[in-house]
Amino acid sequence: MPEETGPLAILFADIAKSTQLYELLGDEEAQSLIASCVTLLSKAALQHRGTIIKTIGDEILCNFVDANDAVAAAKLMHRAVGKLPPINKPGFGSINLYIGIHMGHVIEDGGDIFGDAVNIAARLVELSKQRQILITEQVVEALYPENRGGIQSLYETIVKGKSGPISVYECIWEEEALTIIEKSPLSALT
């Protein structure tokens, strides 16, 4: 029976250029690599108290009771995939991810989750660039103040299925970029 939850942090992660991997490596090798990546993503989510809802090909959907755990898992996902050896094919390099996180109520039904919060998290993945973690204002507000230092406001945008704009932020996870951003931290929400 469908059941509404309290607010959860919904995280989508998608492996960048996976279609190109199949062309470059062939079906078997590409599928093996993608499965290895999805395993790394799952481990990162579980390490930070996440619940794996499902994996869909080159994508993972998980949720977290705490937004701080979701952001920590997203950073770990990028770092884990970043340790994989680069693909030695022209036009490719390292495996990268697109990650989006939104916080809100969802409907749980049959082990899956549905609702506006899930849709917004999925839209963030579509908006993100490789190696980015995009989050919404709801996630920023749920973070502990000490975890907001690497957050940068990007823009407001209308996403498919929403009548009003959402505020999009980037969570900077790479140390060299974090050093730059911390010189002008997000102060609007502290």
PLM features: what roles do these ranges have?
Residues A44-V71, L84-V118:
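Catalytic core of nucleotidyl cyclases, primarily class III adenylyl/guanylyl cyclases
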Residues A121-V125:
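Short amphipathic alpha-helical segments
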Residues P2-A73:
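Catalytic NTP-binding/metal-coordinating core of nucleotidyl cyclase/transferase enzymes
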Residues L84-P90, L97-H105, E126-G164:
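A short beta-strand->alpha-helix segment at the C-terminal rim
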